[in-house]
């Protein structure tokens, strides 16, 4: 099922963000770590645009929570609006037993591992059940991600996007301008800049 979500970079200190969320009625629900390995058929991922690159990518994800690891292979089918913002996405996911063997298979098949992403996630929830995912991304900084819940399912994608954006901006944090941050692509762009 397609879901609308926003992801925006936050430039406040972690402690200030956590205090701001608590002040707005949010409490910590869970913590976990994601390790993502993105693979594509393109030999040089740096030459493609984001939509083409992601449409050709498979990712191997490891989720570490409470000293347990689960692994899966994911394909993200993202729908972009005319401005290149992600208006919705659908994830196709299958569990795998062994992250490293799966990575080795993809490499042996000639796929290019164009991005490795690690982020620590802290999920906050308010009394209505609305969740905010605070993400501490290695090499990039702090992000907030929020996705639609049952209360806005019947709205259009644009209305959902605007609702989520307004919800996040209401906290008063120092936010980036892009509410559709593409973290893997940001890492790729950072690699380009350093070369």
Locate predicted features.
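A signal for specific C-terminal beta-sheet/loop modules enriched in small/flexible residues
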Residues: 89-98, 142-152, 163-166
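Mixed-charge, glycine-accented linear interaction segment located at domain edges/termini
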Residues: 151-183
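Conserved, surface-exposed functional patches that form binding/active-site neighborhoods
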Residues: 112-150, 154
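N-terminal strand-loop-strand beta-hairpin
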Residues: 1-128, 173-195
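Intrinsically disordered, low-complexity acidic/polar segments
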Residues: 17, 67, 143, 153-157
């Amino acid at each position: 099922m397609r879901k609308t979500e926003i992801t925006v970079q936050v430039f406040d200190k972690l402690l200030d963000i956590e205090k701001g969320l608590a002040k707005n009625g949010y409490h910590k629900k869970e913590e976990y770590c994601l390790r993502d390995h993105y693979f594509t058929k393109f030999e040089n991922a740096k030459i493609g645009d984001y939509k083409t690159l992601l449409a050709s990518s498979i990712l191997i994800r490891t989720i570490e929570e409470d000293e347990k690891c689960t692994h899966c292979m994911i394909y993200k089918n993202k729908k972009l609006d005319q401005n290149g913002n992600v208006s919705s996405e659908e994830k196709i996911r299958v569990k795998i037993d062994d992250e490293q063997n799966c990575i080795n298979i993809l490499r042996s098949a000639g796929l290019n591992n164009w991005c490795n992403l690690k982020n620590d996630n802290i999920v906050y929830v308010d009394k209505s059940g609305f969740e905010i995912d605070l993400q501490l991304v290695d090499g990039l900084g702090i992000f907030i991600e929020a996705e639609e819940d049952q209360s806005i399912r019947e709205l259009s994608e644009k209305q959902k996007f605007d609702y989520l954006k307004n919800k996040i901006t209401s906290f008063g944090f120092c936010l980036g301008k892009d509410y559709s941050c593409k973290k893997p692509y940001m890492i790729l762009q950072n690699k380009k800049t350093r070369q």
